[in-house]
UniProtKB/Swiss-Prot annotation:
Cysteine-cysteine disulfides: none
Residues annotated to bind phosphate: R95, G133, T134, R135
Protein name, per record: Ribonuclease PH
Subunit structure: Homohexameric ring arranged as a trimer of dimers.
InterPro entries the record matches: ExoRNase_PH_dom1, ExoRNase_PH_dom2, ExoRNase_PH_dom2_sf, PNPase/RNase_PH_dom_sf, Ribosomal_Su5_D2-typ_SF, RNase_PH, RNase_PH_bac-type, RNase_PH_CS
Biological classification of the source: Bacteria, Pseudomonadati, Pseudomonadota, Betaproteobacteria, Burkholderiales
Family membership: Belongs to the RNase PH family.
Protein source organism: Bordetella pertussis (strain Tohama I / ATCC BAA-589 / NCTC 13251)
Taxonomy, superkingdom: Bacteria
EC number(s) per entry: 2.7.7.56
A single GO molecular function term of this UniProt record: tRNA binding
């Protein structure tokens, strides 16, 4: 993918079309959770914690396998204007439910739940500050928090084998001003003609592709270009995950 001056200067951030936002993972961010990570993707900041619960949902009792699930939420002032807490409204929005199910599915895709035993790994992803890509940052950070929780279980002797089979990470891609771009911030996300969230494993397999035309359509060729950008971006994110765990 070209990184010419034209490619760079036309993005609000000045990034090349194939460039991620500045990205970091800060492990051990909170004291009590078995795993905790503050993930920063540009101005999107998400706190991901992993809690080990010595129980499983009723549908898994007695089956000798575990469960990985997730919850997602945004602080009231994570965005430009204050939003009410969903607890105060008495119910979760459809968006929240969709995102937390996506996070759970993405993590379960790389777990051998039989090796986890009859326990639950509960991931909480709380958006401290949102500037686009919160669900993708949540998945990428939650995997590191989960890895730390599993490492603690193995250190304690509660697990004989590591149930994590592969890494998993996610990134957004989209069409902005007729071009495919990687890792959209809020300004780009608000103006894009297509928005695609891509979840992949460290070995390069797809877990999920969520793509939507935003008042427009996109071609197979444009989708292929966006997926190519996503593959490159996720490879970088997986490297960052593995480096953070060293």
């Amino acid at each position: 993918m070209s990184t010419s001056a034209a490619d760079t200067l036309s993005r609000p951030s000045g990034r090349a079309v194939d460039a991620l936002r500045p990205f970091s993972l800060e492990r051990g961010f909170t004291r009590y959770a078995e795993g905790s990570v503050l993930v920063r993707a540009g101005n999107t900041h998400v706190l991901c914690t992993a809690s080990v619960l010595e129980k499983v949902p009723p549908f898994l009792k007695g089956r000798g396998e575990g469960w990985v699930t997730a919850e997602y939420g945004m602080l009231p002032r994570a965005t430009h204007t204050r939003g009410d807490r969903e607890a105060a409204r008495g119910k979760q929005s459809g968006r929240t439910q969709e995102i937390q199910r996506l996070i759970g599915r993405s993590l379960r895709a790389v777990f051998d739940l039989r090796l986890l035993g009859e326990r639950t790994l509960h991931l909480d992803c709380d958006v401290l500050q949102a500037d686009g890509g919160t669900r993708c940052a949540s998945i990428t950070g939650a995997w590191v928090a989960a890895a730390d929780a599993v490492a603690l279980l193995m250190q304690r002797g509660d697990l004989a084998h590591n149930p994590i089979r592969d890494a998993v990470a996610a990134v957004s891609v989209g069409l902005v001003d007729g071009r495919a771009v990687l890792d959209l911030d809020y300004q780009e996300d608000s103006a894009c003609a297509a928005d695609v969230n891509v979840v992949m494993t460290g070995s390069g397999a797809f877990v999920e592709v969520q793509g939507t035309g935003e008042g427009a359509t996109f071609t197979r060729g444009e989708l292929d270009t966006m997926l190519g950008l996503a593959e490159g971006g996720i490879a970088q994110l997986v490297r960052a995950q593995r480096e953070a765990l060293q």
